[in-house]
Structures are given as C-alpha cells and as structure tokens.
C-alpha cells in the first residue's frame, strides 16, 4: 500500500551496501524509512533526505519498515547547518525525539524550533526547551515541581536531577547549589504549562543553552541512555 506523508528529517545513516535509513517525524509518529541505493553516486534521494528538511514523501508499507519511493522538499532549513551551536543543539533534540514515544505536539514545535534557528530568532532556546519538555513528559520522567520532592515543602531552593525534583533547604543538606528564585519559577512554569500557556512562558522567562543542556541530561539520566551528541554540545559550550 502506497501512502503520502509529510515529515521532518531527523537523521540519515548508511544501511547495508549503499542503502540508507532515514529517521523522520510525522504528525502522528516517528518512522524509520528504508531507501534503496541512497548512497550511490547517482542517487536522487540523497539531497532530499538531509536533516532539517521538511518533505513530502511517497512511501510503501513493508513488513519490516516503510520503503521511500519518491518525494519533494517543502522547505529546507539549510541555515541551521551553517551554525555550529544551533545545529549541535538540534542534533541533540533529534536524538532524544528518536528515542521518545510519539507526542502529538512535537511536529509543530520542532518546526517552530527549526524556523527560529534558521532565521536566527531570539526564541530558539525557548522552542528547544519546549521540545525537551514534551519528550520528558511523554517518557513520564518529568521533575516534581509542586514542592520538595521528598517532603512537599513549598519553600524550595534547588532542582535535583538525581532526586527527581525540587528540594527544600532541609532535604538538600547543602548537597547541590541553590538556584535563584527566577530559575526555580522558570522550571516550574515550564513543566506546569499547557499548550495554551506557551506564549506566557515565552514572554516571562528567558531560556538559553544551559537550560537545553540541563534538560537533555535530565532525559539522558532518567531514561538510562547515553547520547554522544550531548557530550559534544557540552564540549563546545564555552565557545559560544
């Protein structure tokens, strides 16, 4: 059965001899497409399946994985590839999305993120953190932000990755550095907000690469996986 889909290309890799696997995000799923002869010199599909491509694909459903037959590019966000920091951030997002159960909001949010990175807009890190918020929530590993994760005291002073939520002064025992009030409010707002409240969070709080890295490491730690893309992003953090 042949099906037409719209998809965002997350990654492409070689498979067997000259064939390829393309990981894509659609409106309702995360798919791995099989592409015959993708890495042959005369391949017409290689340019089509570059990361940061928003495409329309014709696929054929197969037993193991869908086969990509043909397609066309709706928009290629090529400027992202020219920015080491933004592209590295996006590759972290793509890796985490690829390991996540589908969240219905991810498609449009990732498009907003790509658009912001491509046009060098100020809200890129906000959208990146929203992508991570949805990934974390879909995995059921979101931090406890209604009070101290151990005693529910609402007078909290830090967010602990290992403990899984806010800590009050007593439960922290000076283990972790205190966060300023604005930072605590920001993370509570991030994980309490619904889709209709995103604009409020965007206007009232500033997000940066440190937030992106922290949320990425949160998902990495609590999902018990290792992502080299996060290590690379950390290694170039000081160059920004």
Describe the predicted segments one by one.
Residues 1-20, 25-240:
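Non-catalytic alpha-helical scaffolds and adjoining flexible linkers that form interface surfaces
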């Amino acid at each position: 059965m042949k099906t037409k889909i719209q998809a965002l290309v997350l990654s492409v890799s070689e498979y067997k001899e000259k064939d390829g696997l393309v990981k894509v995000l659609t409106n309702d799923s995360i798919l791995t497409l099989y592409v015959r002869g993708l890495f042959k010199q005369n391949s017409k599909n290689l340019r089509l399946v570059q990361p940061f491509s928003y495409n329309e694909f014709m696929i054929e459903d197969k037993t193991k994985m869908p086969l990509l037959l043909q397609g066309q590019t709706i928009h290629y966000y090529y400027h992202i590839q020219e920015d080491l920091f933004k592209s590295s951030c996006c590759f972290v997002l793509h890796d985490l999305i690829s390991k996540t159960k589908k969240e219905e909001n991810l498609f449009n949010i990732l498009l907003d993120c790509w658009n912001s990175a491509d046009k060098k807009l100020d809200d890129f890190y906000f959208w990146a953190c929203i992508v991570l918020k949805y990934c974390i929530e879909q995995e059921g590993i979101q931090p406890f932000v209604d009070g101290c994760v151990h005693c529910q005291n609402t007078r909290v002073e830090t967010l602990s990755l290992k403990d899984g939520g806010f800590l009050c002064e007593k439960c922290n025992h000076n283990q972790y550095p205190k966060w300023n009030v604005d930072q605590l409010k920001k993370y509570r707002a991030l994980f309490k907000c619904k889709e209709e409240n995103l604009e409020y969070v965007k206007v009232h709080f500033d997000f940066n690469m440190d937030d992106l890295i922290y949320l990425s490491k949160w998902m990495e730690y609590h999902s018990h996986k290792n992502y080299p893309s996060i290590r690379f992003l950390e290694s170039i953090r000081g160059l920004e």
